[in-house]
């Protein structure tokens, strides 16, 4: 039997800060190959100068329902090691807890799923794992390209689980069946520079910029059945002017929108343009651009694998899970283009923090939950 605790210890001890792989895939291949999985490493690079990324695709079985498990082995930097009471890559165990960068996000989910596969043995249908080493940073040469590659190899998926932290206080109390979309924007408001003593010879862009900030900030709608209201938050207001006697020539505004399933990136862009056009900017010019590539919102229907997972959790815990769409973006947004997807993992209270840790009992419970679902869905 494969011990999820030992596998997690071994994974944490690989300092796989994006995009450094360390030995994470070696460990996974060593665990999966004896279970009958064919493991393939795929490296992607390019696209705007992004760094090369190693990815792992492992698959076993043919025909029947095809279950995909997705996750990432990369972790965020640990920061100042002096802020940790346990070294970030030592995987020390104390008082029923295991400490280390990636313990919660999300090497524990991977360790639990691989251990669950070892526990249940042979299954009907097909099981695949798509593991990237670039989820925490640019996410350009990771899951999105790996899934396109897998589809080109003939793989079609019926349901996917992402092992990201999804629970709030106990394993199974919450799963994420959707995510809000995210769009980053920039507005440059241009006026005319001048001396503050002669405002009639200048055109101060700050009042116009403030008008736009107030017009666009806050809720964009009232929410939907499964999503909270869409929200636009300004994050930067910069004029590049440290003096008090110069009216600046321009103001640079940056913002992010987290939006629900009532919007697409295209409709959101048009709405923002419409609000800008309605404002009196006192002859200042406003140029709006989208920064980077927006991620779309998605929602998986409560049927098929989603319904089976809910039933499995309810049977084990006595309570159906909360169906959440909260939180930030994840690689589930890429998987949603191929099949229904749910995030189901541990509580994530300490992810990205110093002294990141999980309870060993939670790791054991997640392993048991995954094993029960594998039997229910593919048994």
Residue ranges and their predicted role:
Residues 94-96, 116-129, 152-156, 216-225, ...:
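Phosphate-handling active-site elements
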Residues 1-78, 250-254, 268-269, 360-362:
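N-terminal helical capping/dimerization or prosegment-like subdomains
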Residues 165-170, 177, 183-379:
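Metal-dependent amide/peptide-bond hydrolase catalytic core
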Residues 70-72, 130-132, 160-164, 188-190, ...:
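Short beta-strand segments
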Residues 40, 68, 128-130, 287:
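A structural signal for isolated positions on well-ordered beta-strands in alpha/beta enzyme cores
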Residues 106-178:
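Acidic/histidine-rich catalytic neighborhood of metal-dependent amide-processing enzymes
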Residues 66-128, 362-365:
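Active-site metal-coordination/substrate-binding segment of hydrolases
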């Amino acid at each position: 039997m494969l011990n999820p605790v030992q596998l997690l210890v071994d994974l944490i001890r690989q300092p796989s800060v994006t995009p450094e792989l360390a030995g994470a895939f070696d460990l996974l291949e060593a665990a999966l190959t004896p279970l009958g999985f064919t493991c393939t490493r795929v490296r992607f690079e390019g696209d705007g100068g992004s760094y090369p990324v190693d990815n792992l695709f492992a698959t076993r079985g043919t025909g029947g329902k095809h279950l995909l498990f997705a996750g990432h082995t990369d972790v965020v930097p640990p920061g100042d090691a002096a802020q940790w009471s346990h070294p970030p890559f030592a995987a020390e165990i104390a008082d029923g807890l295991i400490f280390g960068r990636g313990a919660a996000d999300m090497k524990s989910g991977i360790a639990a799923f691989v251990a669950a596969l070892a526990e249940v043995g042979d299954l009907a249908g097909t099981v695949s794992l798509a593991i990237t080493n670039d989820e925490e940073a640019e996410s350009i040469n990771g899951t999105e390209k790996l899934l396109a590659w897998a589809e080109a190899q003939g793989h079609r998926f019926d349901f996917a689980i992402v092992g990201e932290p999804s629970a709030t206080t106990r394993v199974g109390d919450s799963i994420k069946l959707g995510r809000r979309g995210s769009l980053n924007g920039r507005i440059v408001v241009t006026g005319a520079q001048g001396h503050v003593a002669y405002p009639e010879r200048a055109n101060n862009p700050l009042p116009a910029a403030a008008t736009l900030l107030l017009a666009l900030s806050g809720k964009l709608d009232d929410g939907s059945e499964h999503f909270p209201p869409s929200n636009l938050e300004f994050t930067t207001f910069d004029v590049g002017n440290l003096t008090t006697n110069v009216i600046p020539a321009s103001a640079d505004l940056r913002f992010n929108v987290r939006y629900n399933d009532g919007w697409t990136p295209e409709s959101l862009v048009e709405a923002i343009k419409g609000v800008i056009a309605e404002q009196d900017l006192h002859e200042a010019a406003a140029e709006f651009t989208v920064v980077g590539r927006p991620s779309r919102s998605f929602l998986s229907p409560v049927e098929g694998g989603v319904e089976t997972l809910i039933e499995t959790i309810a049977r084990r815990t006595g309570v159906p899970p909360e169906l959440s769409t909260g939180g930030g973006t994840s690689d589930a947004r890429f998987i949603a283009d191929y099949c229904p997807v749910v995030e189901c993992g541990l509580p994530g209270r300490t992810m990205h923090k110093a002294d990141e840790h999980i309870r060993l009992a939670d790791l054991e419970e997640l392993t048991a939950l995954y094993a029960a679902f594998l039997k229910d869905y593919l048994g």
